[in-house]
């Protein structure tokens, strides 16, 4: 069995997690109390979903997941919510005081009191697996817990489970919408360890997803629930081939192999199509070619970043539903002929495709229409550097005046860590620049950085 353990850290991680597990349960016909009525056996008794759920003796299905937060309110919502019986109480770990938007509190003072408990629980889940494949880590880098405790946990996971792959789903600060003043600090400090300790990191940003909800679903004032349900569809599409059977299954380690050309260049853009409301869906025939084109639209990207400003290094297209390989090949062929979608000259093929026959499930009363087929694209594009340069610029403005730095130093950080993290990100921006540069003559000096 190739199990995956999900780790949800901080408010963003937990709320995205709630949306994901709600969707997984619907997809597999698992009730909120973890029972799976035998008449609803998905896929004729195929147990592929055991990659995400473990079955107890009593026939209850328990998510292989841990929820961690430094303060109790968000986790208490899980403890009292619809799915309270789904999780073992030990899987929900909460502290008493929060990280107060401070990376140093999440990483040093308060985080380190709880991290051993988390690792203990993760170890229990890991011992319950026959062939642990890797970890899916959900967090945001703008706050204190997601960034600080998130980095700390990733560092410790690297020590304890060196070879296991770690996929990050990371919410980055948006260009216009900000939830805290010190976001740039937390993001830079946290990305510093994401660079080292995740194998693939998928960037999400609230503003981009707000825009998709407004534009494609005509929701005037999207809530976090709207956003998270959209994100959960992306994550469900990525993990569908671990949980169902299909024609072209894609493993977690396969993402890594196909998307990451150099170890540091592992920050991905994601997009999903069709994002369409029920009213419109009746009037549209969403062919494979249409949804594929739509996935490449800059407006479909779930991070504010324009792929036309950079070049693609690799793409992973995960189709689900009524899709056959012939259609996929035709659609990809069309994309390759488009001049607007540019690939780097050293990566001529650039496409990895997966097909899964399970059509996308929608949450009842949700915003998305039930469709026959959908595609999720994860792409590695040099334009991701935009996201980092934006944060770096804001970081520099604040750090030049050493604004707010005393809060971090007071929690046991050293100023040197700021400049070290900032230099690391400057190097990352440069790496992206070099990777996108034309020509094959500068390949020899690539060696110093790795």
UniProtKB/Swiss-Prot annotation:
GO MF term set: GTP binding; hydrolase activity; metal ion binding; structural constituent of cytoskeleton
Region of interest: Disordered: 430-450
Biological process (GO), any one: microtubule-based process
Main localization of the protein described in the UniProt heading: cytoplasm
Active site: 254
Site (described: Involved in polymerization): 450
Reactions mediated catalytically: GTP + H2O = GDP + phosphate + H(+)
Anything else known: There are six genes coding for alpha-tubulin. The sequences coded by genes 2 and 4 are identical.
UniProt name for this protein: Tubulin alpha-2 chain
Organism: Arabidopsis thaliana (Mouse-ear cress)
Species classification: Eukaryota, Viridiplantae, Streptophyta, Embryophyta, Tracheophyta
